[in-house]
């Protein structure tokens, strides 16, 4: 996506990035602030959600960079 990128396509890309980024921010914040209070299963679930969102972000970025 160079300098002449379609503004609508750019808006769509930003929108697609926002959801997985929000997941990463939210669950990592929970782990930092309350990780010691959580059950191990909850910590594992949150870490899994973060990993899945990171993979989704990577896929979107790889798609946009082709």
Go through each PLM region and give its residues:
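Short, charged, amphipathic alpha-helical segments
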Residues: 44-48
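Short alpha-helical N-box/ATP-lid segment at the N-terminus of the HATPase_c
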Residues: 58-66
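Conserved signal-transmission helix
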Residues: 1-7, 66
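Short alpha-helical segment of the dimerization/phosphotransfer core of two-component systems
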Residues: 52-57
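Residue-level recognition of alpha-helical structural elements
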Residues: 6, 39-43
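Conserved C-terminal segment of the DHp
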Residues: 23, 27-40
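Conserved phosphoacceptor histidine of two-component systems
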Residues: 11-16
